[in-house]
Amino acid sequence: MKVLVATEKPFSKAAVDGIRTIVEEAGYELALLEKYTDVQQFYDAVADADALIVRSDKVTKEVIDHANNLKIVVRAGAGFDNLDLAACTAKNIVAMNTPGQNSNAVAELAIGMMIYMARNTFKPGTGCELSGKRVGIHAYGNVGRLVAAKAKALGMEVWAFDPFVPTEKMEAEGVKVPATLEELYA
């Protein structure tokens, strides 16, 4: 069985080494297609792959049509927006993703951007602290929860709106829940 990792923007060496260890210990072959610049390279590489791992690379109907042995496609990340699920289904190819995989990195980036903007690095000497400020979080999923925890650690007042998460759960985590989305943005 051949597992293809195809990424225009490569995974870290540590991630590839981890994938390689798992794949080879299972007795399978790992193939890498990194930094490809032509979709034909992707078509050629996927032709004999049994499994495909991608990041945000587009797995279109055309890619699927070039995959003669493909049984599974794994998107390293949340969502399926880059996978043609209808094409996968038509060929009985399992499509999976890894929700939450990068949640902490995304939450850290959000906090980092808040710090950057609060310090007003565009005009040195005019910045402020985040402590005591209010942050509004639109969606309280994996990333939203982590942003809330990090913001609270910085002394921020955290508000969040998510119609799919019970108000009691958010309040139990010290988050203020506005009645409407409009109130969050007010």
Language-model segments: residues:
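Structural detector of well-ordered beta-strand residues that form the stable sheet scaffold
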Residues: L4, I72-V74, V94-M96, G136, ...
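Short beta->alpha connector loops
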Residues: K9-S12, E34-D38, R55-V59, G77-F80, ...
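Well-formed, non-transmembrane alpha-helical positions, independent of function
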Residues: I22, V63, A86-A87, K169, ...
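Short acidic active-site motifs
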Residues: D38-F42, K58-E62, L83, A179-E183
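N-terminal glycine-/charge-rich "phosphate-binding" loop or analogous flexible N-terminal tail
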Residues: M1-A49
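Rossmann-like NAD(P)-binding element
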Residues: V46-I53, E182-A186
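Phosphate/diphosphate ligand-binding glycine-rich loop within oxidoreductases
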Residues: A31, D50-G127
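Rossmann-like dinucleotide/phosphate-binding beta-alpha-beta segment
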Residues: C128-A186
